[in-house]
């Protein structure tokens, strides 16, 4: 099966990243990379990896908090996050610009807090994008002339 345009871009960015970061002696031993699955986690991972390949900064933001075992209570307890409610899934700096990316797959929709957050980012001069697939992210990059191909 032939790769799509965005898969070719992903592969090319990965190849360039490998050439820059690894010695020539081991280049042929590094496996090729496959596109992650089209789930919310897969799309998020592919965007973050692609940004890393390109030398941009990108990080996943967890706003749900975490679980921790409480030895006194002898049970798992929920620890609230310090992140702002409604924060985007991915915070990135792409070519010097703050870009917040919300990943929505399937029937997932934005909450009111997420809409407020998006407006706050835009008012501050940042970019906020909602993507449903890596293809959406690819199209954003294409519209900004930020592709390697």
Go through each PLM region and give its residues:
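Catalytic phosphate/metal-binding cores of nucleic-acid and nucleotide-processing enzymes, i.e., regions
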Residues: 1-149
């Amino acid at each position: 099966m032939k790769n799509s345009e965005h898969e070719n871009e992903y592969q090319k960015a990965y190849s360039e990243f490998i050439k820059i970061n690894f010695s020539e002696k081991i280049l042929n031993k590094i496996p090729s990379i496959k596109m992650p699955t089209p789930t919310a986690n897969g799309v998020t991972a592919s965007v973050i990896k692609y940004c890393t390949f390109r030398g941009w900064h990108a990080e996943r933001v967890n706003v749900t908090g975490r679980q921790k075992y409480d030895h006194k209570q002898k049970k798992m307890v929920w620890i609230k996050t310090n992140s702002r409610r409604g924060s985007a899934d991915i915070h990135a700096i792409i070519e010097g610009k703050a870009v917040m990316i919300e990943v929505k797959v399937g029937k997932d929709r934005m909450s009111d807090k997420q809409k407020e957050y998006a407006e706050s980012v835009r008012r501050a001069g940042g970019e906020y994008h909602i993507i449903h697939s890596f293809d959406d992210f690819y199209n954003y990059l294409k519209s900004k002339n930020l592709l390697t191909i």
